[in-house]
Amino acid sequence: MSHRCVLAVVVLAFAAGWCMCDVGDFAPCLQFFYKSWPPKGLAGTPICQRHINQYVFATLYCRPRRSPWFSAYLYSAPAGKRPTASWKFEPQLAYPAADGNMIPFPPGPLDQNVVDSQAVEPDYINSTYSRGHLNPSLHHKSHENRSATFTLTNVVPQKSGSNDGPWEDLEQTVNRTLGAYCLGEAFVVTGSIPYQNDKHWLHNHRVAVPEYMWSAYCCPNYTDNLPEKLKDAFPTFAAIGRNDRNSTEEIVPVDKTAKKQFRGYDVKRMPLETLEMYLKDRFSTVVSVFYEQCSGSD
């Protein structure tokens, strides 16, 4: 789609008053949260991520940081090859009355409202950070759903030493574990943790860089014959990963024997309660990821 066509879609949608309320309310996509209960304690702009007229996952977006606090989704075992990246943006962040389907970035200049409202591709060009998925394509079955994860509203600046190393290993581990032992729906929430001083940004205060990434899943219905090493991985599992090799080791220690390119980007697995303790400490408020900590009670 040309730059002119993208502008026409956005402007016509605004003029016509189309609004599916995909931005500003999680109500249309509560199915991606355990017990229809979004995480509590974090403030931001809810996005029901819609691709080809289907809701695929949910994101809590921080407009001032131009990056997500978390993305929430239902795990499904992947099929086929990883899609070729076709990066997209959220039109309703720029124009609230626009159509809610994510749109591929056009070649050439972008509408300034889009640039002002969210991260755009030039933010990552010539930076030392990769585009780190919160909701990874690996955790989805259909090609369409996997393709939908390639939106910059689902991405944080992530060091390649993390993205291509320990964090990728975590995503693969979660994929194998849920695929083999989760018998029902598996709800996953993956998010970012800011620096305490919040002074790390891309391109002159355009996009905030997180110090850590975190992830947790809730699978209330799982097999009875779990391997001994996985008995503490159900019904919940959580982890925090380093995104700065120079961060202190209070939260995640460093394995000094790791390969040089991955050293300092360790991932620490922990109980859900421990993750929420670290989130409370960094965000200075109680953060609850799952309803009743995925206890299954009503």
Question: What is each of the regions a protein language model found here?
Answer:
Residues C5, R63, S76, L138, ...:
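Residues that form ligand- and interface-recognition hot spots within folded domains
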Residues C19-F70:
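Signal-peptide-cleavage-adjacent N-terminal segments of secreted and extracellular proteins
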Residues L7, C21-V23, Q31, R50, ...:
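Residue-level detector of bioactive/disordered segments in secreted/extracellular proteins
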Residues H51-S130:
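Short, His- and charge-rich active-site/binding loops that engage polyanionic ligands
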Residues P109-D298:
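Domain-level detector of nuclease and nuclease-like folds
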Residues G17-C19, A27, P46, P157, ...:
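Extracellular secreted precursors and ectodomains with disulfide-bonded cysteine-rich loops/domains
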Residues S2-C21:
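Cleavable N-terminal signal peptides of Sec/SRP-targeted secreted and luminal proteins
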